[in-house]
Amino acid sequence: FTGVIPIAGDQVTSDIAQALRTPTPQAEDIKQKHGCAVTEFTKDDETVEVLGVGGRPPRELSRSSLADIIQPRYSELFDLIKAEISRNGFEDKISAGIVFTGGTSKMEGVVELAESIFQTSVRMGIPSKFKGMETILQNPIYSTSIGLIEHGYKQINHEMLAEQNQGFFSKLLRIVKSEY
């Protein structure tokens, strides 16, 4: 099952940029370094520096205020995903759990927020079958790409094996036909 949901991490970045009146690249940086999807996971003394724009000085923002921007958008995203799963008749299938991939899955609190909405176990998908580049590739941002490469590789191997087998059986059939 695959589906397209029209909001994701970029929408969260846009929300942060608008709420903090900061450029999108800085909002993305703030999201990646300080983002939290569950306000209750933040500590009272945690702050985030927001660079000033147009010559204004930088200002400090509590990390819980940042989470207050992030949490509703991810809740909305997970609600949309849950509705899409139900609409396609797969709600009974998610009891085995959900695997998140991509950069969003790395944010603190995303897994726990998703578990509370989906009412099932959720984990971060991390590629693990590669030797030599583990420190780089064992990152959820590469999960989808690596999975597609692996699927393509298996598909090519399957097709090559089918061609080899077809060649053998074709030869056998020709021999049998020529003898009879």
Ranges and model annotations:
Residues 1-180:
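Helical "lid/coupling" subdomains associated with nucleotide-phosphate turnover
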